[in-house]
Design a protein with these regions (language model features):
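Charge-lined substrate channels and their catalytic hotspots, especially those that engage the 3′ end
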Residues: 1-247, 251-297, 308-310, 326, ...
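Conserved, well-folded catalytic cores of nucleic-acid-processing
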Residues: 25, 88, 103, 107, ...
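Feature marking long nucleic-acid-engaging regions of large polymerase/nuclease enzymes
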Residues: 138, 223-435, 449, 496-514, ...
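Structured C-terminal cores of nucleic-acid metabolism proteins
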Residues: 411, 440, 444-644
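Flexible loop/turn segments at secondary-structure boundaries
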Residues: 170, 229, 252-254, 387, ...
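Alpha-helix initiation and N-capping motif
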Residues: 2, 97, 159, 173, ...
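Residue-level detector of short coil/turn "hinge" positions at structural boundaries
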Residues: 29-30, 187, 423-424, 449-453
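Short coil/turn segments at secondary-structure boundaries
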Residues: 177, 192-195, 212-215, 314-316, ...
Length: 644
């Protein structure tokens, strides 16, 4: 049913018989119109799910995207989080309002909860809706007592029985499974899917005909040091000034409509945790046959990009043999110390392209923006607790890969523009609205960064970061600017990418971990290598596919964020009653303090005192909640001197 409801956003020619009563006499009668022999959802109506946060219900659309998730009004108290509902949307300057109209489908009759004692009885408390009435289970109190304290369980709501035990909430090793389960991420692949993956994994590159042999070219991959799924490799021919970008040809191993394809599409993206990955494809493919491992012949789609004429980039089906799998740290050491065990031709390729990449980046930033994302990498011990946190910043090695990938992605977007008249699978990013811009100006004013009169939004962002660098506030200001942006989205129609400054852009370079790239590969291969017979069919499904991918992208981010929040809450429990230097990050309903010693750990403080953003304080951690993933504390002192 969910597939049918999503199709109403884009128009459906015929209403399937089982759903006809919904349209003719049922809850969808007032919400659906017929236009040019297609049925569409009327303007102002939306279908989606409920997401609870801090006792408020938010609306998550199946296909539409809002700057902020609409707040649901008049929702009946009995509704479960995973129910599909029809809403009327009313736009507002701050946040859209969703008025509940009808329930369409209870997607699942299970719920994640934890066991706790209330009124001398062990009951189940819903994880996402802990404010609701506890669930009394059919199991005997004696049997429930045998389970660990605060045991996390999956409950069959119809039977009021436990269907799965995840483990004790206090056990840090539960966190991966818990975050995945809370957002209904399927963890395991079906037997059919695993068998099919194993079959394709046994095929050799030599089994595939009509491919260009690139195995003489010394490609290199550059990834995080713990990476195992190598999507892309590069080589720069200095003499010809041609950049070669090779990307794993995953579509050869994942037939359209096969169990492999269906399960990859359901996942949409790989989920990454600090010590593990839950891949979009089975490991035999994602870390095996598709991964561009050194000294292994692999199928690849290879771009040859002449840097003197980017419009003449050409895409080929090839066989490659990567010369080296390297980590960013290794390449950075080589670029700074000019010492490496890499072959000379690889060294020359990297040094030659670095010069080009830095120039490309400089030119790109005249129209695009460098968001200076400071990524916090968590290192966990064997018990699943945070051992240390490292802040990772962009380096020359990152620039090398980033600029090469941007060129390949742009080249792919150009093919869509040229051959499909601006239709396909695009990656788009809208400029913030005037309201969003004003809010950012106000927040930066608190940081004593003022917007000069008549300065446009884009020049002001650069101006703000320049001042932030001088004030040593680059991290804080970058965080504010990133928060002010719209989400980048997938679109079936060409739109610009504000952040990058590109008129046209797509995702091509990560087909092992993103279904969007895999789908784009199929479209481009059909166009270039198969007489374009299936292009119209593939294009027809892109509106629905892009809507799915946008929802799955959001879900993946929520899973990863939920995991990190709970890890920080666990860390805070080890630091109770201890005091730390911190800086005020936000002043809203309370004060949010970021710790200097544990970067990324945010402490919520309820206080009647007035604090300003960037004020240096001493904060004591008083409480942490593993269910909400929140940390509370109290400010014990204002620090006058500068905290470096």
């Amino acid at each position: 049913m969910q597939g049918f409801l999503r199709s109403l956003f884009f128009g459906v020619k015929k209403i399937p018989k089982p759903f006809a009563p919904l349209i003719e006499k049922g809850v969808l009668k007032e919400a659906v119109r017929c236009n040019k022999e297609r049925y569409f959802l009327k303007e102002g109506f939306d279908i989606g799910k409920i997401e609870w946060a801090e006792n408020k219900a938010f609306f998550i659309s199946l296909a539409k995207n809002y700057p902020k998730d609409p707040l649901i009004k008049n929702l009946p108290p009995s509704f479960k989080t995973d129910a599909l509902i029809l809403c009327k949307i009313e736009c507002s300057k701050k946040r859209p309002i969703a008025f509940f109209k009808a329930a369409l489908l209870n997607a699942d009759h299970t719920m994640i909860a934890y066991l706790a004692k209330k009124n001398n009885q062990i009951v189940a408390i819903p994880f996402k809706e802990s404010f609701k009435k506890p669930i009394l289970l059919k199991h005997s109190q004696r049997s429930l007592l045998e389970l660990p304290r605060h045991c996390v369980v999956k409950i069959d709501l119809k039977k009021r029985e436990i269907s799965e035990i995840l483990g004790a909430l206090e056990d840090p090793l539960i966190d991966e499974n818990l975050s995945l389960s809370l957002f209904d991420r399927i963890k395991d692949f079906s037997k059919d899917c695993l068998n099919l993956a194993q079959h394709y994994a046994q095929l050799k590159a030599s089994d595939f005909k009509n491919r260009i042999n690139y195995s003489h070219i010394p490609f290199i991959t550059i990834d995080p040091k713990d990476a195992k799924d190598f999507d892309d490799a590069i080589f720069y021919d200095q003499e010809k000034r041609v950049l070669f970008v090779a990307v794993a040809d995953v579509s050869e191993f994942v037939p359209k409509h096969s169990s492999l394809d269906k399960e990859a599409r359901i996942r949409g993206f790989s989920v990454y945790f600090p010590n593990s990955v839950y891949p979009m494809l089975p490991l035999s493919l994602s870390q095996g046959a598709c991964s561009l491992k050194a000294f292994e012949k692999r199928l690849a789609l290879v771009y040859e990009i002449p840097l003197d004429n980017l419009e003449n980039a050409r895409l080929f089906q090839g066989v490659i043999e990567v010369r080296a799998n390297c980590a960013y740290e290794e390449i950075n050491h080589f670029l700074s110390a000019n010492q490496s065990s890499l072959d000379k031709d690889l060294q020359q390729s990297l040094l030659g392209f670095l010069e080009v990449a830095l120039r490309l980046k400089k030119e790109r930033l005249k129209k695009g923006f460098n968001f200076n994302s400071f990524e916090n990498k968590l290192y966990l011990n064997k018990e699943g607790r945070i051992e240390k946190i490292e802040t990772q910043k962009e380096s020359d090695a990152h620039t090398l890969i980033e600029e090469a990938m941007l060129l390949a992605n742009q080249s792919s977007a150009n093919l869509l523009d040229k051959h499909f008249h601006n239709k396909g699978i695009y990656r788009t990013h809208k400029e913030p609205s005037l309201e969003q811009q004003k809010r950012l100006y106000g927040k930066l004013f608190d940081y004593e960064i003022m917007r000069p009169k008549n300065m446009g939004f884009f020049p002001f962002l650069e101006h703000a970061l320049k001042i932030a660098k001088e004030k040593k506030l680059e991290r804080e200001v970058s965080r504010l600017i990133i928060k002010s942006q719209n989400l980048a989205l997938y679109s079936p129609m060409q739109e610009s990418h504000f952040g990058l400054g590109f008129a046209s852009y797509t995702h091509f370079t990560s087909p092992i971990r993103r279904y969007s790239d895999l789908a784009l590969h199929r479209l481009l291969k059909e166009l270039l290598f198969h007489q374009a017979k299936g292009c119209s069919y593939l294009l027809e499904e892109t509106p629905e596919l892009c809507a799915e991918l946008n929802a799955l992208q959001k879900k993946t981010a929520l899973i990863e964020r939920d995991f990190v929040k709970r890890k920080f809450a666990r860390l805070a429990l080890e630091l109770l009653e201890k005091e730390f230097l911190g800086v005020v990050l936000e002043v809203k309903d309370g004060v949010v303090v970021g710790l200097k010693e544990w970067v990324g750990l945010k402490v919520l403080v309820k206080t009647n005192k007035v604090f300003k953003p960037l004020e240096k304080v001493c904060v004591k951690i008083t409480h942490a909640d593993l269910v909400l993933g929140q940390v509370w504390g109290e400010i014990t002192e204002r620090i006058k001197e500068h905290v470096s």
